[in-house]
Amino acid sequence: MAKDEFSDKKKPYWSKDEAVANIQRYCAFQERCHKEVRYKLIEHAIYGDLLEEIISDLISNNFLDEEIFARTFARGKFRMKQWGRNKIKQELKIRDVSAYSIKAAMTEIDGGEYLSVLSNLLAKKERTTTFKNQLDKKKKLTDYALSKGYEYDLIAEMIGKR
């Protein structure tokens, strides 16, 4: 079968009751942002007032909570993927999370643990990478930490201590 045969398949339409049940299950499985839920409903031909009504019901029944999503997302990305604050903020903004929820999510990252993780990332990268000279080393370590979303001033301070 060709890959394109699957891309033309349409998602089945949901009735209101099916949409509510399926989206509640979708939200109960893991925390979701409003954008993901909205996209899922639109995928199944739920639009306009019905879409807004379903989202409103999800919020009032605690199936959808933007702040809890943001906090969970930040904790998970920091602990599992060792992302820095900048990358986490950027991803939350892409998902249309409010500034208030992003600020709340940043409180989930302990300052001491944050510095420790950055230090460990730099040490591991230093062990596994070859460098031509000190300038090359500084550039590669800085680029790596920036790509993980860490702040430049913290990176420069850590590299300066090495």
Regions found by a protein language model. Give the residues of each.
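An alpha-helical, amphipathic repeat domain used for nucleic-acid recognition
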Residues: 1-162
